Amino acid sequence: MFMTQLESAVAGVVTKEMKVVAEKERMDEEVLRSLVAAGKVVIPCNKQHTSISPEGIGKRLRTKVNVNLGTSKDVTDYDSEIEKVNRAIRLGAESIMDLYTHGDTRIFRRKLIETSPVMIGTVPIYDSVIHHQKDLGELTAQDFLDTIRLHAQDGVDFITIHSGITRKTIDQIKNHKRLLNIVSRGGSLVFAWMSMTGHENPFYEYFDEILKICKEYDVTLSLGDACRPGCLADATDVCQIEELVRLGELAKRAKQYGVQAMIEGPGHVPLHQIQMNMEIQESLCDGAPFYVLGPLVTDIAPGYDHITAAIGGAVAGMYGASFLCYVTPAEHLALPNADDVKDGIMAFKIAAHAADIARGIPNARDIDDTMAKARQVLDWEAQYACALDPERARSIRESRAPEEDHGETCSMCGKFCAVRSMNKALQEEYIDIL
């Protein structure tokens, strides 16, 4: 009889996926199993996704990075998207979310799942309009459920559903004045559907039906935050927290049913509120893994939002966020190109690594210490090997090499290099500067 990762963990069974994750994390298998059983770690791994190399998300594990990809009606270039996927995997992203909103979405989704070793996530409500070829207001609750089943059958490892907003939220949004209302794309569609049809949110009303589908294929739920703040002024407001309370309740229901769940979080949050947001989520959601978009710590940096978001991501990770959704320089401006994707990934790999060091993840700082030793002896090849982006590090140094270079220094300091001077001084060698 098939059991989900959560059911197996509760039953005391260490699955082959848990063994892989435990080895990657250098963690005892039984410790990992107990964390999965407690709902504090998830291993998104659809039984149909046979090419996956599973990763764990949650307590005591390395911080993971997700990359959002997908075409829109204005930019449809499948070859370009495939190249972005390949680049994301090469650069170390642990997850890709397929957010296609135009064209034959299923062909790309199936190809992605068939070949990708990383976990794949989707937002089924995007695909509902395309798959059923209906306008939003014409879709039925059954249409949404059918799309979820289709994604599960195709092998999607986790799905984002915005189950936390209800008819009550409509009144809250109208009465509680926000500067930016709802900025979640999926959340705005659910809000609009409820407004047009007069019906309750189908992802909330039929949550038990969704759990049945997820359990059948072992799809992890990513409970989306429709009311995440889209600007600093809306951070940590009534709408955000009220929804988070409901998401925590839904996560507990999923756990009781044997379905893994994680919680999505903000958004745009001032730096001084990030720790508080992480602690509120920890309390309300019983330690379920927290998946955050950034958060962005200022609203005024379009073109540089990979930086504003990575700052927030590092702090969020330090205080407990387990999963960071990358942000690119194109955020708020355009569909990201391949260079934007790389910039976003590198910013968030740095943020995730910095958070792991701050949280004391075992062995997280080893590579930093190895880099320091390589710098101490001016071993450039060893430094490149330690770098998150060896190709870029090598390219920068070699394109601006010092005129008098014997493999020791760089053009920043040349013979004024502090490391070179100290090495020679400690070895009682003559220090030539001119």
Task: Give the location of each predicted region.
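C-terminal catalytic subdomain
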Residues: 300-309, 314-361
